[in-house]
Amino acid sequence: MSDVQVHQLYIHGRYVEATSGKTFNSINPANGEIIATLQQASEQDIEAAVKSAQQGQKIWAAMTAMERSRILRRAVDILRERNDELARLETLDTGKAYSETSTVDIVTGADVLEYYAGLATAIQGEQVPLRESSFFYTRREPLGVVAGIGAWNYPIQIALWKSAPALAAGNAMIFKPSETTPLTALKLAEIYTEAGLPDGVFNVVQGAGREIGQWLTEHPVIEKISFTGGVETGKKVMASAAGSTLKEVTMELGGKSPLIICEDADLNRAADIAVMANFFSSGQVCTNGTRVFVPKSRLADFEKAVVERVKRIRVGDPMAEDTNFGPLTSFPHMEKVLSFIESGKQQGAKVLIGGGRATEGELAKGAYVLPTVFSDCTDQMAIVQEEIFGPVMSILSYETEEEVIQRANDTTFGLAAGVVTQDISRAHRIIHQIEAGICWINTWGESPAEMPVGGYKQSGVGRENGLTTLGHYTRIKSIQVELGDYQSIF
């Protein structure tokens, strides 16, 4: 234990002792070892973070947009210089394969920051003439202090997705990472400070339990909450935010997304997409296409192609260069996923491959679940209805286009969807009828910085990334100017 580093809170440009006296551990899910101990924030610490953010935000907002842009661009450069170092830490904390974290997590997060750094100077109002002697103009002003609450599956990427538009618009952010994977958010705070961000503009407060999130959502100074996580927690966060000071919210919640394979689809392409849409990041992606709809006439061939590809997945030590599938992010989550797999078996689904925990050799020490494919699934099964957030694919057969559209939409979620077909007219026809916020045709999973992402139904409120998101970190002030005489009716 003496070799385990203790991490403090990051407030006002430096590490500070938490006042709670409580700590919690970060666990390497590949072997169960403690990799860090973290101090837990108290309500007093949240107050200090808010006060710091208020001070820093005034300095930050007073800078020119070009000055803010330059500082954010410097942070991008540092992120890219330290990509491998950050990726190793992300792998230790999350269990994701280093081959993934080194090429995706930091890379795509830095891309989003670079995108918004470029847009910082493009925040504009408008001027509208009313008559010869009068006009009005608008200003887009920062909200002030905002809060981000992150999820455990993409820690640094989510921290960047939330902080980039907020900071570009002139706000300060208090960020709470998931207690399961909190380490890279602290490194991001260091990088922002090194890049020249004024003290207090990005503070990190970590801790286990719901209290920290509640303190943030109910704090009267905080103007907006951006949350990524589960639906039930999201509902509570949204209710708390509305019940305190009517805060603005962005909610990126769960999904149970349909992937529709059409009868004319190239089978190899369809199988490749289905495997990526279910097993990338060990299945821990909110947009995963876990309900795979296949025409009855293609079902047997498709299942064979999928199983062949799953057999090629390299499960192993996430730090090994050839591993492309690591453990789940925590042992409690592993147990949850395994319980869903057992439910699928009990409800009559057929296991084509996988179906349990990986227990061979060193894998037995970690939170490893084998890539699992179920066939003979029905829409009523728990594995088809509920978000599992693990490496579990459910294959469902269908006969007509009308049928598959209806079944694809028969869910409380609406985050993502995909269609694989060689008929582009059919692709658009289907996608336009699917109730989902992020859709892919003949591909899956890419979320470029320029593309807004978010869900329909209970999968979320608002969007992240893209031009539209920047506007939601500002508020519009309208100013009318009268150049002529003023005439009162009194």
Curated annotation (Swiss-Prot):
Binds 2 potassium ions per subunit. It catalyses: betaine aldehyde + NAD(+) + H2O = glycine betaine + NADH + 2 H(+). K(+) 1 binds at S26, I27, D93. Pathway: Amine and polyamine biosynthesis; betaine biosynthesis via choline pathway; betaine from betaine aldehyde: step 1/1. The modification Cysteine sulfenic acid (-SOH) is found at C286. One of its GO terms (biological process) is glycine betaine biosynthetic process from choline. Its cofactor is K(+). Its EC number is 1.2.1.8. The active site is at K162 (charge relay system), E252 (proton acceptor), C286 (nucleophile), E464 (charge relay system). CDD domains: ALDH_F9_TMBADH. Keywords: Metal-binding, NAD, NADP, Oxidation, Oxidoreductase, Potassium. K(+) 2 binds at L246, K457, G460. The record marks E248 as: Seems to be a necessary countercharge to the potassium cations. The keyword Membrane does not apply. One of its GO terms (molecular function) is metal ion binding. Gene3D superfamilies: Aldehyde Dehydrogenase, Chain A, domain 1, Aldehyde Dehydrogenase, Chain A, domain 2. It comes from the Bacteria. The keyword Cytoplasm does not apply. Belongs to the aldehyde dehydrogenase family. NCBIfam families: BADH, PRK13252.1. Involved in the biosynthesis of the osmoprotectant glycine betaine. Catalyzes the irreversible oxidation of betaine aldehyde to the corresponding acid. Dimer of dimers. This is Betaine aldehyde dehydrogenase. It comes from Acinetobacter baumannii (strain AYE). The lineage of its organism: Bacteria, Pseudomonadati, Pseudomonadota, Gammaproteobacteria, Moraxellales.
